[in-house]
């Protein structure tokens, strides 16, 4: 693992090579948590859940704080962030706002993933694995180089798991599932100054999840997972990225074209109780297209220049029906309606009742979005000093057409069943746009010993729409119409504004030993955030959640990383501290200024030792023991800071053997079976927690031909 790479003088980053990923059995971006200082992606929910927190800031739903690029192509929907990492050459995690080069939704950084190249590696790779929870993992790939200028590869993988958490109401595990993927890559060098690189991939997910257990705040006890409707997540994705580069004497022109299709379906028992409250679905089909043109000139005397244009278009068609059942009808609708009915009609001789024991609030949305950006970054070198300045001008527009509707039949008298039909409809459209100026400035001083730097960068997170609020809006409209007191409702609360931040850094990347065996990285940072986007639950027995803009918040802290090679030993260690609080946030019912930001850990720790055990070559070419420990905490679960997860640490280990074309590994995670929570939320007045995976282990067999 490298603690910095690339233009290390300008930002803080961590890179993991293929050998790091495979020897440590890292198969998902979620396992980067704490390996990268102040980076945390909790494992809960399903593969749809990609909540990432960096330096105290993050997002549970909608827009991410971290962008993701695979072979240079941006991933436009964070529902696709959690996928199987197979045949990955390296991963780079950049921390801090990356607005100039990457634009929207990179206020916390960017994750750059690079797959294996058929021009650099040729052969066949096969992996067979079996582990805890009856988990099976199969991987197969072929890399070929038909000439010095053309290479191609094909790779597939399949995973299965029975799951780790049992739903005691349904009598079976709730988080098992299957996923598979296919990747095709072609690289062509038609001439010395032209390259063409195309990657086509498809993925499929069919799984459960949402192992949420009810928490009793009075007894502080966590009940077993028990809800009566099955939860599931299905996802089909197609992605294609085409990168064409033209090389000139002093410059490079790059064109990157990306297309992505996401078709996913989520089904939830949204009350997560063994009661017939309500369930919901979310079905979406999203197409996205991106195009970027970049000119990079590095040999202009003391100057260097990078500039380009970027554009994107997304079209999302979504349905989010909410299925109310008998207990939910009685307690969430009729109870409130009858209380209001008695208030408006004195005497108490009337009572509302529904003929249906269940009904559906249908919510359909069409959400197109497009954006365009111009960016430039220039630098100059003055001896040991380097100065860089950049600016990105970005505009984006998004609209939402909504159609919410429900039909029920009701009566109003206790004794006489006078049937009435109520058709409630809420239709309309909203739009939001933003024009952002994203500057950056950095100064670095370096030599053979490393460098020190100072930087200031601005980033922004796009605004959007609270689609999950529409069932609540229609429910309130329905209650008003039932009691003869219709209310004027609008969709203004469904729009949230962009989030902006400035990241200021002082840092150093040092290699004090002449042999390069010691790398040290240190960073001090301060983040000033305006209009922070927070996921909140409306007051009362709400069925939805919403994104809200807080007034202002900040985070300051430190990041440290060390890598040391000593003979057959490799030591890696990292530490992150983020002191993140609200400066201004009046929620209406409480002034939360000074409270810690929720869901992000205050500290992260990591330590890993790899020991290449000396053995006769007749036994093994490689025999490596890896022992790692990651620590996270404290994490506050709400804005009031009344609930929190104390600090916890997870121990992992692996033993890797390779001889010729063959290899095997034994691995284990959470070896001490630590009990900890990864997520908390409230639903219709109830508290729930998701727990971390228990001790799990497995064995892998590898063949490389």
Per-range role (PLM):
Residues 1-22, 50-51:
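N-terminal periplasmic "start-of-domain" segments of outer-membrane beta-barrel proteins
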Residues 29, 51-56, 69, 90, ...:
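N-terminal periplasmic accessory domains that precede
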Residues 123-125, 130-161, 169-207, 235-240, ...:
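Transmembrane beta-barrel wall of Gram-negative outer-membrane proteins
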Residues 243-268, 451-455, 478-549, 554-556, ...:
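Membrane-embedded beta-barrel scaffold of Gram-negative outer-membrane proteins
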Residues 313, 460, 630-638, 656-705:
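C-terminal beta-signal and adjacent terminal beta-strands/loops
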Residues 71-97:
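Short acidic/polar hinge/loop motifs at secondary-structure boundaries
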Residues 296, 302-306, 310-312, 381-384, ...:
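Gram-negative outer-membrane beta-barrel transporters
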Residues 13, 30-73:
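Extracytoplasmic beta-strand/coil segments of soluble accessory domains associated
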